[in-house]
Design a protein with these regions (language model features):
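Secreted/extracellular ectodomain signature
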Residues: 13-138
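Bacterial N-terminal signal peptides
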Residues: 2-10
């Protein structure tokens, strides 16, 4: 999470105060089940939106990161649902991860979608020019 803070600060500091930042596209690569790290991602999203509301953001979860969007397991369900209601944001889960964890798609929070392969999704996003921010447990 510290690395994300440094990158976010550099992005914000690099913007000229009098200019409107150009929208960009970023994917948060989340594999941790630590509620503090998951909450930090939501905070980064709020801060990015406060500076640049047109930025496209995707939170991609695989491994233990899936807990953020599983009904009955997520401690942040209300925050995720609120964030999704503002647009320019998607929460996506790796189908391999949920299959390995025996999670059915029906257990995911509303409006959370799946991708066949989380790592493949990240690679595809990078090819499309998306920034990739790896969120690591601390």
């Amino acid at each position: 999470a510290i690395g994300v803070c440094a990158l976010f600060a550099a992005t914000v500091i690099g913007a000229q105060p009098s200019s409107r930042p150009r929208p960009y596209k970023v994917v948060f690569d989340l594999t941790t089940d630590d509620p503090k790290d998951q909450a930090a991602v939501l905070n980064y999203i709020r801060e990015i939106r406060s500076v640049n509301p047109d930025t496209d953001i995707e939170v991609l979860m695989y491994g233990r990161g899936t807990s953020m969007v599983v009904t009955g397991r997520s401690t942040l369900a209300d925050d995720v649902n609120h964030a999704l209601g503002r647009g320019h944001l998607s929460f996506r889960v790796c189908e391999i991860a949920i299959r390995n964890q025996k999670i059915d798609k029906s257990q995911l929070l509303p409006n959370v979608t799946t991708v066949p392969d989380g790592i493949g999704e990240i690679v595809a996003k990078q090819k499309e020019g998306w920034g990739d921010i790896k969120v690591v447990a601390h």
